[in-house]
Amino acid sequence: MNQRLSALVNGGFLSENEAHQLMHDMMSGSLTDAEVAASLSILAHRGETAEEMTGFVRAMRQKAEPAERSLDVVDTCGTGGDGLSTFNISTAAAIVASAAGAKIAKHGNRSVSSKSGSADVLECLGIHIQSTPEETRRQIQEKNMGFLFAPMYHSSMKQVAAVRKQLGFRTVFNLLGPLCHPMQAKKQIIGVYAKEKAKLMAEALAPLEPEHVLFVCGEDGLDELTITANSYVIELKKGDMTEYTLNPEDFGLAKGYLSDIQVQSPEESAKLIQNILNHQTEGAPLHITALNAGAALYVAGKSESLMAGTLKALETIKNGAAKEQLARLKQKTKEEEIYA
């Protein structure tokens, strides 16, 4: 039996280095499916420690395909798994934030359990998702936003894909994805489906010295800053960790209903996003997009506070800049036309 797995079976905890080696073994295909399943099951049952998570993240980052790491970018992504079937809020927020001057490197995938993954809705919006690393870098520099399609950068995940599908329950990989940005983005908005997992992820990321990251979790269970209730926030900024609760009404945003932001398909999500960016939709969809875009602008250093960022995001939508940015993102480059 694998030495690290043996420690888990016997009720032990792994050091950061041991966790790093276990994840390296998983990603390298040197464990049997049974050993992978046992490791994931034990961790899911007893819960991962922050030290173990840090080791896992280091290993996954090392196994990721090379990507540009010199750009000052922000990622807006989440763990998913909230089961609430909302439209792609973080994707809409990314477009608005990029229209307002933030450089966004959106890391995402197709849907696993939701109605619409970020890759799915971007395709419906007419935005190319399978760009090369070099093309993505150019998109970020020239258009303020590029998409990093997760399977293109985390090919070693195929070693555990079958086991994860067979297990059918959440595993540590649901938490690791947002922490393993291919560009190793130092600025992020990370949505988390549960408050205790947000704390775990923050404690795991802190030793890796991020510049400015917000972990957000709605009291309604949404893995975003929500508009239907208060949101729990953990802020990591240059080594300091603070926790607070955010009430959308403090930002002048009336609380809405989940039913106002739920969709049944990527096509429906894309239509709602277009309406938001065209400023043809008011209420909860507009407000939740602005709130999350405002957070991205705050983390990017384009606004001095969450409040200022939210107001800037609203103005970006109202003055037509967000609509123009969507049109710009749809324009194909020569390279994209060749591979289309």
UniProtKB/Swiss-Prot annotation:
Coiled-coil annotated spans: none
Binding site for Mg(2+) 1: S90, E224
Family annotation (Pfam families): Glycos_trans_3N, Glycos_transf_3
Cofactor section: Mg(2+)
Catalyses which reaction(s): N-(5-phospho-beta-D-ribosyl)anthranilate + diphosphate = 5-phospho-alpha-D-ribose 1-diphosphate + anthranilate
Alphabetical keyword list: Amino-acid biosynthesis, Aromatic amino acid biosynthesis, Glycosyltransferase, Magnesium, Metal-binding, Transferase, Tryptophan biosynthesis
Protein's pathway: Amino-acid biosynthesis; L-tryptophan biosynthesis; L-tryptophan from chorismate: step 2/5
EC number assigned by the record: 2.4.2.18
Sequence positions that bind 5-phospho-alpha-D-ribose 1-diphosphate: 78, 81-82, 86, 88-91, 106-114, 118
UniProt KW Transferase keyword: yes
EC category name: transferase
Binding site for anthranilate 2: R164
Cofactor note: Binds 2 magnesium ions per monomer.
A single GO cellular-component term on record: cytosol
Gene Ontology annotations of biological process type: L-tryptophan biosynthetic process
Binding site for anthranilate 1: G78, N109
Family label: Belongs to the anthranilate phosphoribosyltransferase family.
Database matches in HAMAP family: TrpD
Subunit-structure text: Homodimer.
NCBIfam families attached to this UniProt entry: trpD
Name of the molecule in the record: Anthranilate phosphoribosyltransferase
Taxonomy of the source species: Bacteria, Bacillati, Bacillota, Bacilli, Bacillales
